């Protein structure tokens, strides 16, 4: 790849962001935000798809496909502990799964 100005800026900003999140407290806060955003997305998808019952099966299939692809990428590859993107995506998936689990409890009661 050519060393253009844009390529250099993106590379430097990525390194600065990676350096910024090396701090354990920032990493924990990013993980917590990812989990809460996943929880919000799962609840929003469940309630939106539940309003129009035609999309229930399609949304469930997409969420299942997303979760399985994240699992395959995260666990098969042997992700290192320092891989922030994989860790944040896996925690987002946990938030989505947990929110759907709680939505099922709400519907069952």
Curated annotation (Swiss-Prot):
Q: Which family does it belong to?
A: Belongs to the ycf20 family.
Under InterPro entries, the record lists: Uncharacterised_Ycf20
Q: This protein is called what?
A: Ycf20-like protein
Question: Which Pfam family, any one, appears in the UniProt record?
Answer: DUF565
Please name the source species.
Synechocystis sp. (strain ATCC 27184 / PCC 6803 / Kazusa)
